[in-house]
Regions:
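A conserved ligand/cofactor-binding region detector
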Residues: 1-786
Length: 786
């Protein structure tokens, strides 16, 4: 184990050399930087050794537009086994390590896609797998969210303003990226991924876009000050923010440049590594390298690898043969708008060579399908480049060795619906890899109290082998449950204090904590939750609901800046919160709070404190979800639909220990073309009452018409979607029944606590350790280096 005292001594030396101060004089950012640098120094030998070990074996690379790493200082100290010692040593010197909770998360992701990537890297490092990640070093990430008059406001998330001590700039590994209209430098920053209980350390390499020439001195001398830095700004725009708004032509070009920048830089780097160890013959490249595409964002890597191999002297056929043996593709969505398509002319204007290569790949697919006797009608449905568009998901499916979904129901939809044409031709290509989470961050680190409760009963083996947690099923006595409930109450009190400090809202810890935290999207149905809260509110007010257990409804979500309806839903939820929180009749019955700037670190407070986890997307829309797993692991029941990993959670923990409701995917598919939500609206007074709050002045959108637009989208639809596209009214009454049943069951603290603890005890399947082992064994064919 690394010596904590040595790290503290080096930290104090850093403070003296960098700032000429002692620890007691240092600010939180100064302490964080010095401590981080001391840890980076302490792990440097192991990091270097791990890089060398990985070089000489078959290895895998993870390409992702997002990585939600969370606060790294606590996680790294925890994985090194010295968090408690460092905390004690700092406390003895008058410093509280908890002050570092004010340090910004690295703004490198948005939702589950990025957090999954981070969990995978953690699991791979912990289990000594040769996996490295590649991503982008966004200057401002997505955005920092706040609310003004109930509306979401976005501002730049300047997470690097106090430095970035967990990254190391590698100028010697810089590569050049060529677009049709500019050349830029991709400068790598390396971030260590510290494995738990091992000397193995993985690497996340993040690319930053910089100009070939920092500054046009001649233009500046001619007093053309803006022009002197214009090119620098254009280049830096490429990695300025995550997911640039693509509602305009220029926004689309920038987003494509971002994706190509990630792909080309990473592939050039991998080829360089390969040649350094194995020489210039790239014919065995696929035998030594596996690359996983995390969704469609890095799919442009496929034609780019072909281009790079052709530049090394290969012909197209040889280059493409190697390429399709190298890549695998993880699909994360069945939403048509998220299955990326690029206008062909726009694509050609950015990377013309790749447009030609994609056309050739399309020809290969056509000829192979014809040789297999596939009908022309089916071939037409499978075109990669057609109708003036390039379909990136189709490209990824055809040109990858394996394609996987991320929950069993999702993988079934891929096989039998979304990609059924490909599945009919190459069924062995398709796999399921149910998502997972790292129990080290999402239990060991964020819920020390529950982790200690478990360790006292079954030992600590679950930290590296979550299947061990099933032993907890033998510890379900009333006394065990009472002790578990005490832990849960501690976490609720802690979250209550955090929310009071950050949001200015008091939520009594003795209330039920009913939580929905996730990306804001119509299909995730935060609006359904809000309408249900209004139904409860009205039912309490009119006396028809007399046995309601006092509840705090907690929301957290960011809406994409250009997603107008999602932002309107945020406004509606905040208006509902204002209505209820200001009503004296509700003081001891209900609270509603929408936390601002929900992120990984906020989640670490919320997940352990929740009593009820809302996972309410309509069946067949959520690929998997990982928030549902984090809640489950922390002893929270799921109030959810037959969707994504909810199904597998209910299978593992038992439906009797969760609250599953709503139409199945088969039923929704059968009624999709004939479903009329107005029949429900007209026939169910409770539905009409809550729907009318959008238009009758109960809550106000300031006369903007935004709430009326939501109302009309549900009852009448729009040109681009059917009425009630996500079946809010269809599922409303079953949802209310399940929600109120869970609320009522909470009163029996032992019985409800047993449901919660049974979820924790049944969470073994949902470790990213299990998921990453399956990827390693069945997709990448890589082995542990230990």
């Amino acid at each position: 184990m690394m010596e904590a005292a040595m790290i503290i001594r080096r930290m104090e030396e850093e403070l003296r050399s960098d700032y000429q101060i002692e620890l007691v004089e240092a600010s939180t950012p100064q302490i964080h930087k010095a401590l981080s640098n001391a840890v980076m120094y302490a792990i440097s030998d192991n990091w270097r050794k791990a890089r060398r070990e990985h070089e000489h074996v078959r290895r895998a690379y993870y390409f992702s537009a997002e990585y939600l790493m969370g606060r790294m200082v606590f996680n790294n100290l925890y994985c090194l086994g010295i968090l408690d010692q460092i905390r004690d040593l700092l406390r003895a010197r008058g410093c509280d390590i908890a002050s570092m909770e004010d340090i910004e998360d690295a703004a490198l992701g948005n939702g589950g896609l990025g957090r999954l990537a981070a969990c995978f890297l953690d699991s791979a490092a912990t289990h000594d797998l040769p996996l490295d990640g590649y991503g982008l070093r966004y200057k401002f990430g997505l955005f920092k969210q706040s609310f003004k008059n109930g509306y979401q406001c976005e501002k730049a998330d300047d997470w690097q303003r106090y430095g970035d001590p967990w990254s190391r700039r590698r100028d010697d590994k810089t590569v050049e990226i060529t677009f049709a209209d500019q050349k830029v430098m991709a400068v790598p920053y390396d971030m260590p991924i510290v494995g738990y209980g091992t000397d193995n350390i993985g690497t996340l390499r993040l690319w930053q876009s910089e100009p070939l020439e920092e500054f046009d001195f001649n233009l500046f001398n001619e007093q053309e000050y803006d022009l002197a830095v214009r090119e620098k700004n254009k280049v830096e725009d490429i990695t300025r923010v995550l997911y640039p708004n693509d509602s305009t032509y220029e926004g689309k070009r920038l987003r494509l440049k971002q994706q190509y920048f990630l792909s080309s830089a990473s592939l050039q780097d991998i080829i360089r590594r390969y040649k350094r160890v194995r020489g210039n013959d790239l014919s065995n490249f696929a035998a030594h390298c596996a690359i996983q595409l995390n969704d469609t964002h890095p799919t442009v890597s496929i034609p780019e690898l072909v281009r790079l191999l052709m530049n090394e002297g290969m012909d197209f056929d040889a280059a493409f043969d190697i390429t399709r043996k190298t890549f695998s593709y993880t699909n994360h969505t069945i939403m048509s708008e998220a299955l990326e398509k690029w206008d062909y002319d726009l694509f050609r204007s950015v990377v013309p060579e790749l447009a030609d290569i994609i056309s050739r790949i399309n020809e290969v697919q056509n000829s192979e399908l014809k040789a297999r006797g596939v009908s022309q009608e089916q071939i037409d449905r499978m075109q990669i480049a057609t109708g003036g568009q390039i379909h990136m998901a189709r490209l990824a499916v055809f040109a990858s060795t394996y394609v996987n979904g991320v929950a069993q129901i999702h993988s079934d939809i891929l096989r039998h619906d979304l990609f059924k044409d490909w599945y009919s031709v190459t069924p062995d290509k398709f796999q399921n890899k149910t998502n997972g989470i790292t129990q080290r961050r999402w239990l060991g680190l964020c819920n020390r109290e529950l982790s200690e409760f478990i360790t006292e009963r079954i030992g600590g083996g679950f930290i590296t082998d979550l299947s061990e947690i099933s032993k907890l099923k033998q510890h379900m006595s009333d006394a065990d449950i009472a002790a578990f409930n005490t832990v849960k109450q501690q976490k609720k009190a802690q979250l209550s204090a955090v929310i009071r400090e950050k949001e200015g809202v008091h939520i009594p810890p003795e209330f039920v904590f009913d939580v929905q935290v996730k990306r804001m999207h119509e299909y995730k149905r935060q609006l359904l939750n809000a309408l249900s809260i209004m139904d409860i509110y009205y039912s309490i007010k009119d006396g028809s609901l007399t046995d309601f257990t006092p509840t705090a409804f907690i929301f957290g979500a960011k809406a994409a800046p250009g997603y107008i309806r999602a932002k309107s839903i945020i406004k509606y939820i905040n208006e509902v919160a204002n209505l209820i929180n200001s009503d004296p009749d509700m003081k001891d019955k209900m609270r509603v709070v929408f936390v601002q700037n929900y992120n990984c670190s906020y989640a670490e407070h919320i997940m352990p404190a929740a009593d009820i986890s809302e996972q309410i997307s309509p069946a067949g829309t959520e690929a998997s979800g990982t928030g549902n797993m984090k809640f489950m692991l922390n002893g929270t029941v799921t109030l959810g639909t037959y969707d994504g990993a909810n199904i597998e959670i209910a299978q593992e923990a038992g439906e009797e220990n969760n609250y599953i409701f709503g139409a199945r995917v088969e039923e929704l598919n059968a009624i999709r073309d004939t479903y009329n939500p107005r029949e429900i609206y007209d026939g169910e007074p409770r539905v009409k009452r809550v729907m009318d709050t959008l238009v009758n002045g109960t809550v106000s959108d300031g006369g903007t018409g935004k709430f009326a637009e939501i109302y009309n989208s549900i009852l009448n639809g729009e040109s681009w979607h059917r009425p009630d596209n996500y079946f809010l009214l269809k599922d409303f009454m079953p949802y209310m029944e399940a929600k109120l049943r869970a609320n009522h069951d909470y009163r029996d603290r032992i019985a409800f606590g047993r449901k919660c603890l049974m979820n924790t005890a049944s969470a073994g399947k949902f470790s990213s350790d299990r998921t990453i082992a399956e990827y390693a064994r069945e997709l990448w064919h890589i082995d542990s280096v230990k």
